[in-house]
Structures are given as C-alpha cells and as structure tokens.
Amino acid sequence: MLNASPETAQLIAANWQRVLSEVAEAVSQAGRAAGEVQIVGVAKYVDVDLTTQLFDSGCHALGENRPQNLWGKADAFSASGRKPVWHLIGHLQRNKIRRSLPHIGWLHSLDSLRLATALNDEAAAANLRLKVLLEVNITQDATKTGLPVSELGKIAEQVAAMPHLELRGLMAMCSRESGGDWARREFAEVRSLRDQLQIQLGSHCQLDQLSMGMSGDYREAIAEGSTMLRIGSRLFEGIL
C-alpha cells in the first residue's frame, strides 16, 4: 500500500512528462534520433513510496547512490511485482558486492581495478554478467571519485578481459552543475576518451554508453553524446 497522496502522485507524473518533453526537445536540437538517450530517475533522496510513484509514472530505470537504499527498495519493488532496472550510480564497497549483485542491472561507478576484480569474482560465483561503466575523474580533482584519465586505458583493457563484466562505456560528473560552455567542454572530453578507448579495445568491446548529465546540465550532455542522463531533483520538484 502506497502512502503518497494522490496529489503527490499527480505531481510526480507531471514532472516526469515535463522532463520527457524537455529531453526529447534537447535530443532533437542536437540532431540526434529519438530513443538514443535514456533517463535514469535518481531516487536517492526519496523513500520507497515516492520511488514507486516515479516508476508507476513511466520511469522504469531507477538510480540509487547507496547500496543499502537500493537493497530495501529492490525488495519492496519485487514484493509488489514491479520490475525496474536498477542503476547503482554511487560508490560500491567490496563488502557490499554480494548483497548488491542480484539487484543491479548497471553499475555506473566502477572506479578501481580491485573493485572490478572483486565484482568479476562474485559475478562468476552467481553465474551472471554485470554491465559496467568506468567512472572517470575528468576534473583531475583528487577529492573526486573516479579513475584518473592517465590510468583509464590500462584499466579498461583489464576490465574488458573479465568474462563476468560487460564494459559498456564511461560515466562522468561535470565539475560545475550549472551547465554552459564549461560543461560542454568537459562532456566533449569524456566522449573523446570513450572514442579513443573504443579504438584501443577494438570491435570485441562495444562502448556504446556515456552516462553524463544531471538536472542542471543534461542539455549540454545530450549535445555531446550522452546516452544516459541521471536526473533526480527535477523529477521531484514541488515535493523535496
């Protein structure tokens, strides 16, 4: 039984439709085909009821930052018969891999070889293959998470060789959240890095995904080739 009011449900549904429309407009303006860009609804600040309302509004790709939050929501969704694709976009500690793996469809935040090795081992034991993105620290800021650009090629080769990980692309956060030319330059650099990796790894590895863009800079991300937008606050405007 959902505790969210009918008014809240209507507001979330309206927010979802507005974001869909805005993203479609940005995709068209960028000269890209409809359907090239997926919206991952980031529900890290809301409870299971509001997350469920978002799913029921049509957002079936859901993102969480914390593994513990994902576990609880995934269990609740499963009990209700709802089947979203869960995207873990925050840091995953190695001691939380086993509990997380059955739920995760995508991991956006693969940021070390140690984590990749542990993930591959656990995925092998569970007889599954996990879709992963390498998180790159495009800002070169030591306080930020993600792989340094200088290590990206070497680690990508090692991850691509792991049989239970399916390397599909890169994830990055812009150093500024307000969008504009600064964001476009950084997103363009991420796209260029992905293109270089694709050449390096060859046709056996399909790097077709770029997880770039959030509520404040998704237009710039779309213009520079993003395929996954991590949208949170815009979907819950008027509620949070």
Task: Place the predicted regions along the sequence by residue.
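Gly/Pro- and small hydrophobic-enriched strand-loop and loop-to-helix capping segments
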Residues: 226-240
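Conserved alpha/beta-domain cores
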Residues: 1-216, 224, 236
